[in-house]
């Protein structure tokens, strides 16, 4: 049967009415319902944060919740919004790791504050399109101001620039794309080699794969006793590749590794890069925030010599996911890789030769990620942010001090930028394999208790317990109680009875 457009929509209207459902996306009545629920939610989330320490760090869903969600279909007809809201609170949001918990010490914990959450809510409500100046001119200006401020902190020159992206993975990928296009011709790509340490974040290799490099083009450089890149090993690897007619083109250094918080010798690496005409990228996703600390920023000496820098605000600058930046020494390198001027965007260009954010990275449609950081910084201030960084470092140093006082434990990697690694070794004669199992079980027992979360990692072939103490709400009491709990786990208690 053929319908005119009017008949088609009339039939839809009739079917909806006959089915007893006439739901539009935007109605005054529904907006009132959403407003009431939002008021309720705000009160609930404030109470949740006020009582965060009473919550279990890890909240595991039961089997019934998974089965319920698995069977839940996408409905043909809409459901009451309060039902969906309550269902999501109960089944989804109540069954997540609380990365923002003061005793969440695994991975790189979230330090997200309610300020950032508020910025998220505001930005998502107004939904600015942050691809170019004409779409959101004030938001565009805020992003430019923040990028300039962060470039200044990194010691970059006036021709530097960058943009906000979703996270460190995309920041690193964006920088490596610029490095490839700056340093290599098309024919040179197949022989190109990039260098990184055995502590480099996995996102680097993944990004290289995405932009056309294979694993055979990556050289993993050994680290020294402090888990920093060995410069002698780096130079040897480069010389071998040159003799084999390869093309060394980039070195990735870490400013705060995920495992240990170690900072590679940035100044020495910059010398190598200049000597061999290579791109110098610093993955500062975690550690770059230390630039705000007057006391610890010296640990990042040499970062100002890099060609590019990734920096996650959602790690140590109180931001919700995802809020990251890629900074580049010469913004024209990003333009060279990403500039696009299709005919359908010409009316959105400020001038014929204007540079918009779609010219600086892989995204066209992009949210205004900078606004929540702007709200946070305007409210908290740079000095307090620096104190937050210093507090996180101090908590790791306290953890190291406590662990060293007990001969049953050994420090494997001392406190660096808020991260410390240690291992239960006991006074008994045990194999390394048995010690690995014991430390894994200690981690599991502490995490399953809900009191704290401590995951393991591996350093020099050993299973170790790792604590990242960067949450500004973490107190000395939290550290003492957590380390006391480690000593009282059933695993250690049972060993003491043998």
Predicted regions and their residues:
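Active-site C-terminal subdomain of aminotransferase-like
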Residues: 276, 301-404
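Conserved PLP-binding catalytic core of the aspartate aminotransferase-like
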Residues: 411-446
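Short beta-strand
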Residues: 410-416, 454-459
């Amino acid at each position: 049967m053929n319908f005119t457009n009017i008949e088609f929509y009339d039939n839809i209207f009739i079917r909806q009415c006959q089915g007893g459902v006439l739901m539009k996306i935007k109605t005054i009545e529904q907006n009132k319902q959403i407003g009431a629920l939002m008021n309720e939610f705000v009160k609930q989330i404030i109470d949740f944060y006020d009582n965060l320490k009473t919550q279990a760090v890890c909240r595991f869903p039961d089997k019934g919740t998974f089965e319920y969600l698995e069977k839940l279909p996408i409905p043909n007809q809409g459901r009451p919004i309060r039902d969906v809201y309550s269902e999501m609170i109960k089944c989804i949001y109540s069954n997540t790791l609380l990365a923002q918990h003061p005793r969440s010490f695994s991975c790189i914990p979230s330090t997200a504050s309610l300020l950032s959450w508020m910025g998220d809510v505001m930005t998502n409500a107004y939904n600015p399109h942050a691809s170019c100046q004409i779409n959101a001119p004030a938001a565009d200006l805020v992003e430019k101001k923040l990028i300039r401020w962060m470039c200044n902190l990194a010691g970059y020159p006036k021709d530097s620039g960058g943009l906000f992206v979703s996270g460190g993975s995309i920041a690193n990928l964006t920088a490596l794309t610029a490095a490839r296009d700056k340093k290599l011709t098309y024919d040179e790509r197949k022989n190109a080699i990039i260098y990184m340490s055995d502590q480099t974040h996995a996102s680097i290799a993944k990004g290289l794969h995405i932009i056309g490099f294979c694993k055979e083009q990556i050289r993993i450089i050994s680290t020294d006793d402090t888990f920093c890149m060995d410069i002698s090993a780096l130079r040897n690897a480069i010389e071998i590749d040159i003799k084999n007619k390869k093309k060394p083109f980039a070195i990735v250094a870490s400013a705060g590794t995920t495992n240990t918080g170690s900072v590679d010798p940035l100044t020495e690496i910059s010398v190598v890069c200049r000597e061999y005409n290579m791109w110098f990228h610093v993955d500062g996703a975690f550690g770059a925030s230390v630039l705000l600390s007057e006391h610890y920023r010296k640990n990042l000496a040499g970062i100002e010599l890099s060609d590019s820098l990734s920096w996650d605000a959602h790690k140590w600058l109180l931001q919700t996911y995802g809020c990251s930046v890629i900074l580049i020494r010469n913004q024209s390198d990003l333009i060279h890789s990403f500039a696009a001027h299709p005919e359908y965007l010409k009316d959105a260009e400020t001038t014929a030769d204007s540079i918009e954010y779609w010219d600086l990275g892989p995204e066209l449609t992009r949210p205004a990620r900078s606004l929540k950081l702007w709200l946070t910084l305007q409210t908290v201030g740079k000095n307090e942010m620096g104190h937050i960084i210093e507090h996180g470092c101090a908590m790791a140093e306290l953890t190291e001090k406590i662990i060293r006082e007990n001969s049953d434990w050994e420090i494997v990697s001392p406190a660096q930028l808020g991260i410390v690694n240690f291992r239960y070794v006991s006074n008994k004669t045990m194999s390394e394999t048995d010690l690995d199992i014991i430390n894994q079980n200690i981690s599991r027992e502490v995490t399953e208790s809900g009191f704290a979360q401590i995951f393991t990692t591996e350093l020099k072939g050993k299973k170790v317990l790792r604590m990242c103490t960067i949450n500004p709400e973490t107190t000395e009491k939290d550290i003492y109680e957590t380390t006391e709990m480690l000593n009282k786990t059933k695993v250690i208690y049972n060993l003491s009875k043998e």
